[in-house]
Structures are given as structure tokens and as C-alpha cells.
UniProtKB/Swiss-Prot annotation:
Name under which the protein is recorded: Carotenoid cleavage dioxygenase 8 homolog B, chloroplastic
Family label: Belongs to the carotenoid oxygenase family.
UniProt effect for mutating L112P: In d10-1; dwarf and high tillering phenotypes
Pfam families, alphabetized: RPE65
Biological role: Involved in strigolactones biosynthesis by cleaving the C(27) 9-cis-10'-apo-beta-carotenal produced by CCD7. Produces the C(19) carlactone and a C(8) hydroxyaldehyde. Also shows lower activity with all-trans-10'-apo-beta-carotenal producing a C(9) dialdehyde and the C(18) 13-apo-beta-carotenone.
One of the record's GO molecular function terms: 9-cis-10'-apo-beta-carotenal cleavage oxygenase activity
Induction info: By auxin.
Major subcellular location class: plastid
Record's subcellular location: Plastid, Chloroplast
Transit peptide, from-to: 1-43
The keyword Plastid belongs to this UniProt entry's keyword annotation: yes
Length: 569
């Protein structure tokens, strides 16, 4: 393809990926010249006080070693690999779980965890953690007992791959292999329309205010509704508005009454802020933030909100339309690093859609924001926004460290890039610059910090505790669970040699008045090839119980909790 054709193709991709580009909105200030800142299942209702039912199918065999990529690309599978990085062997399973310890009797509901679980098709192995087809895991708790399940999410991408034995949609680093030049041209046409983008919803899982459960990824078409009781794929979640766009934040902010999301616009670089009422499929336009730097919007995997404001981050890791056209990925995949473009934090009023602050901040890289809240003066006036995130010291290396051959490496070297709790202070007094500091000594959590949760009652409000994955070094991936105390600036850590825990999801005890009164639940892939749901006391961060699967499960990403009142029949 000629450079001219490539440039034209990139423009077409940008047009396809823009969201609500023609919608009117309020723009962030373009000025501020000056010095740069530095710095899943058996129906849950069937679980009774009686002994749990026996498995309805035999447990799967041990997960299969992933094959080496044809042609020698990528890392292969060996017998010494951890089960966390091996493909799940069976499409679905359900049955009773053996419990060690005592589960709290108040723990009554369903824990769901989503994430990639299938990284190979026949003898073809995928490159990257984020390429895997979605595997939904469920653990239902009741009366001190647990029933577990897993199932593949029936996305169009997964069904097509299963039917044809090859990648048929564009995943994070994988693209369909064209048979000839005409086939390649046809693929470009489908990319421009968005039809070749994946709907593989392997990232998040959320419960909407009306009880519907969605699995999500960064493509809007990858919003898929599932049944939390059966793990059946109900179907695509169809947005009924005309906001458009093909990509959005993988992590919306969801409460009992509303749903907030960001839609990047690659034509006029910026972000559309939208909200949706519980029970509705219609997103409503709230406002627009124009980017202050760079050729494209910064990546927005997640974002925080406060009671009255939406915080829109703009980091130098920016979307790159031309990288979408590549058959082979760059080390930054769909992104480019534009340090010269600056880093910014924008604050929008929820009620009016107006930009109330747009400040330059030191460079940063984050996948996940933890929380945000409003700082007030003695008279109760909001003077600043505090926003915390899992920050990777402005180092983009973490993206390539998540290649599967890196994760499967058993070299024993300390190759996990450092991370910290980064705390932004965004003044609302018209200042040009904001601050970014380290909220606590990173050695408290082994200089690893990601995959976080908090007490849901404190979303958008002042808080003290966060639960996340940390590190015990040397390691190549977060291998501990961490409770962070942001007041005392300390951390408590749980670690089991050779295990790979996933996001610790905090479930508050009903009626609790203290922020850390509850449990943190994490799915753990153990060194011996087994898997279990670990339940830690929210206060002491000591093990309460573990519900053991009869087989090992691959690593997963994000979780949600469905209380019994929501999923009972």
C-alpha cells in the first residue's frame, strides 16, 4: 500500500472510530501557555442450606499448554508454565466447591469475574494477554457454601474463531490473516466501518442499576449482556441513542441510578462524556472535552468521577489510527507515545456539562483509576479534585510486558515495571497546573499496583482503603494482594508462593458502618495448577476461607458482585 493510500486509510479509520464527532458541546480551554508542569453456572437460587449439588459435568482436564505460534513468533507453552497463562480446557463447567475455612454467613450472592481464558486456536497461539477469548467465572455463596462455574462468552468473535479455527476479527494484537491482496483490501473496508473490530468482551463485568449484567471491552460492540445465574450469553447490549463511535472506556462508572462513560473522538481529538439512566439503553450527551495536545486522544481505559464532577484524563499514550492497519503490532500496539504533547486532567460539571478545570500535569501512564473526591475549604466550597490511580511511573513498558511469552517466562528475573498509587490534585481556582504525587511509599506494596477496588459506598467520595494487586519481587507480574491505607500510608499484603491472584473485589457486609467491614474476594491460580476463590477479611486482610475449584483457571481481569436480592428467582 502506498503512503498516500495509508494516509487516506488512517483518516478513514479515524472517521469510523470517532464518537459523536458532529455533536455540539463545550470545549476545554486551548490556552494555558507557560512553563510545563513537572513533577460462572448453576442457578444461584438453587444453592440452599443443604449440601451443594454434585457437579453436573466432570471437571475439565488440566488446562492445556499453549502451543508455540506458527513460524516461531511469540512464546510457547511448556510444562513448567503456571496455570494462570494456560487456556481453559473446556467451554463450560459447574458444580459444588470444596471450602477450606468458614465463609461468612452474610456473604449471600454471586461473584463474577471476567477475563481472557482462551489464548490458542488449534496450533496457533496468541501474542498478548488481552487477545484471549472471554471466560466468565462465577462463584455463588450462600449459607457458608459455594457453587462455582465458568463459561465462554458467546461473542461473534469467539463463535467465528471456533467455527473456522482462526482469528476472524481484529483483537488487541491479533488480526485476521488475508488470503490475498483483494482480501486485504476487503479487510480495510470492514475496518473503516467497524465491522471487523472485535466484540470479544474479555475485560470488565458490571451490574447495572436495574440488575442487568454486562461484560465489556473497549469496543462498543463488545458490550454483551449475560445471565448471572446461568452464565448464558443473552445477546448484544444495543445502545438506542445516536451518539455513535466505535470505542469507549472499558470501565464505565456504574451506580444504582446511572452509568457514565467516555467516548473518544479521533476526528476532532477529544472525548464525549455521556450518561445513561438505570433501566435505559439510551446514552445522553452531557458534554465534550477537546484534547489540548497530540494528534489523537489519550487512551482512556478508565476514568473517575466525584459527586458533582467527571474527571477526564488526557495522557501522552494516545490512540494511533495507523497502527490499527498493521498486520504486526508495535510495542505500543494501538497507541503511540507523545511526551511532547503534554498531559492534562479535565474536570466537567455533571449537571451542566461545563469544563470547570483543565490543568497540565506531569506525564503519567495508567490503566486504572482508583477513585476521586472533592476537596473543600472551611466554608464547604469545592477547591480541588483529588484523583487516585495505579500509575506506572510514565512508563509504557507494561503494555509489552503483558505479551504471553513474557508472562510464561520462568527466568526468575525482576522484570515487572514499577507502579505506585499516583495522586492528582486538580485545583478549581483557574490554575494552569495540577499536581501528581506518590500517595504512599511504593515499597509498602512491592512497587506493584494495579487491578483495584474500593467499598462501593465511597465511589466519588472521600475514602481511606483500596484493595489491589501488588508485588513480591522478583516477579514478572503482580503476585500479591494488597490493602492500602491512604491515611496511614501503609499497606497489608497477602502472598502465596507461585500463585497469581486476580483483582481483589471488596464486598461490604450488609449494615456495615466502617469502610473496611467486609471481605475481599480474589480468584487465585495456584502454583500446583489448582484454582480457588480466596476470601480475605476486609479489616485484617487475613484469609477467612477459600472455595476450591477441582481444576485450575486461567488469569482473569475484573469482577462484580450480584447480591442475592438481584439474582434470586
Amino acid at each position: 500500500m502506498s503512503p498516500a493510500m495509508l494516509q487516506a486509510s488512517s483518516l478513514c479509520v479515524s472517521a469510523a472510530l470517532s464518537g459523536a464527532a458532529s455533536r455540539p458541546g463545550r470545549l476545554a480551554s486551548q490556552g494555558h501557555q507557560g512553563k510545563r508542569a513537572v513533577a460462572q453456572p448453576l442457578a444461584a437460587s438453587a444453592v440452599t442450606e443443604a449440601a451443594p449439588p454434585a457437579p453436573v459435568v466432570a471437571p475439565p482436564a488440566r488446562p492445556v499448554d499453549a502451543p508455540r505460534r506458527r513460524g516461531g513468533r511469540g512464546g510457547g507453552g511448556g510444562g513448567g508454565e503456571l496455570v494462570a497463562w494456560k487456556s481453559v480446557r473446556q467451554e463450560r463447567w459447574e458444580g459444588a466447591l470444596e471450602v477450606d475455612g468458614e465463609l461468612p454467613l452474610w456473604l449471600d450472592g454471586t461473584y463474577l469475574r471476567n477475563g481472557p481464558g482462551l489464548w490458542n486456536l488449534g496450533d496457533y497461539g496468541f501474542r498478548h494477554l488481552f487477545d484471549g477469548y472471554a471466560t466468565l467465572v462465577r462463584v455463588s455463596f450462600r449459607g457458608g457454601r459455594a457453587v462455582g462455574a465458568h463459561r465462554q462468552i458467546e461473542s461473534e468473535a469467539y463463535k467465528a474463531a471456533r467455527a473456522h479455527g482462526k482469528v476472524c476479527y481484529r483483537e488487541f494484537s491479533e488480526v485476521p490473516k488475508p488470503d490475498n491482496f483483494l482480501s486485504y483490501v476487503g479487510q480495510l473496508a470492514t475496518l473503516f466501518s467497524g465491522s471487523s473490530l472485535t466484540d470479544n468482551s474479555n475485560t470488565g463485568v458490571v451490574m447495572l442499576g436495574d440488575g442487568r449484567v454486562l461484560c465489556l471491552t473497549e469496543t462498543i460492540k463488545g458490550s454483551i449482556q449475560v445471565d448471572p445465574d446461568t452464565l448464558d450469553t443473552v445477546g448484544k447490549f444495543q445502545y438506542t441513542d445516536k451518539l455513535g463511535g466505535l470505542i469507549h472506556s472499558a470501565h464505565p462508572i456504574v451506580t444504582d441510578t446511572e452509568f457514565w462513560t467516555l467516548i473518544p473522538d479521533l476526528i476532532r481529538p477529544g472525548y464525549v462524556v455521556a450518561r445513561m439512566d438505570a433501566g435505559s439503553n439510551e446514552r445522553q450527551f452531557v458534554g465534550r472535552v477537546d484534547c489540548r495536545g497530540g494528534p489523537a486522544p489519550g487512551w482512556v481505559h478508565s476514568f473517575p468521577v466525584t459527586e458533582h464532577y467527571v474527571v477526564v484524563p488526557e495522557m501522552p499514550l494516545r490512540y494511533c489510527a495507523k497502527n490499527l492497519l498493521r498486520a504486526e503490532p508495535t510495542p505500543l500496539y494501538k497507541f503511540e507515545w507523545h511526551l511532547e504533547s503534554g498531559s492534562y486532567m479535565h474536570v466537567m460539571c455533571k449537571a451542566s456539562g461545563k469544563i470547570v478545570a483543565s490543568v497540565e500535569v506531569p506525564p503519567f501512564v495508567t490503566f486504572h483509576f482508583i477513585n476521586a473526591y472533592e476537596e473543600t475549604d472551611e466554608e464547604g466550597r469545592v477547591t480541588a479534585i483529588i484523583a487516585d490511580c495505579c500509575e506506572h511511573n510514565a512508563n509504557t513498558a507494561i503494555l509489552d510486558k503483558l505479551r504471553l511469552h513474557n508472562l510464561r517466562s520462568s527466568s526468575g528475573q525482576d522484570v515487572l515495571p514499577d507502579a505506585r498509587v499516583g495522586r492528582f490534585r486538580i485545583p478549581l481556582d483557574g490554575s494552569q497546573f495540577g499536581e501528581l504525587e506518590t500517595a504512599l511509599d511504593p515499597e509498602e506494596h512491592g512497587r506493584g499496583m494495579d487491578m483495584c477496588s474500593i467499598n462501593p459506598a465511597h465511589v466519588g467520595r472521600e475514602y481511606r482503603y483500596a484493595y489491589a494487586c501488588g508485588a513480591r519481587r522478583p516477579c514478572n507480574f503482580p503476585n500479591t494482594l494488597t490493602k492500602v491505607d491512604l491515611v496511614e500510608r501503609t499497606a497489608k499484603n497477602w502472598h502465596e508462593e507461585g500463585s497469581v491472584p486476580s483483582e481483589p473485589f471488596f464486598v461490604p457486609r450488609p449494615g456495615a458502618t466502617e469502610e473496611d467491614d467486609g471481605v475481599a474476594i480474589s480468584m487465585v491460580s495456584a502454583k500446583d495448577g489448582s484454582g480457588y476463590a480466596l476470601v480475605l477479611d476486609g479489616k485484617t486482610f487475613e484469609e477467612v476461607a477459600r472455595a476450591k475449584f477441582p481444576y485450575g483457571l486461567p488469569y482473569g481481569l475484573h469482577c462484580c458482585w450480584v447480591p442475592r436480592k438481584r439474582n434470586s428467582k
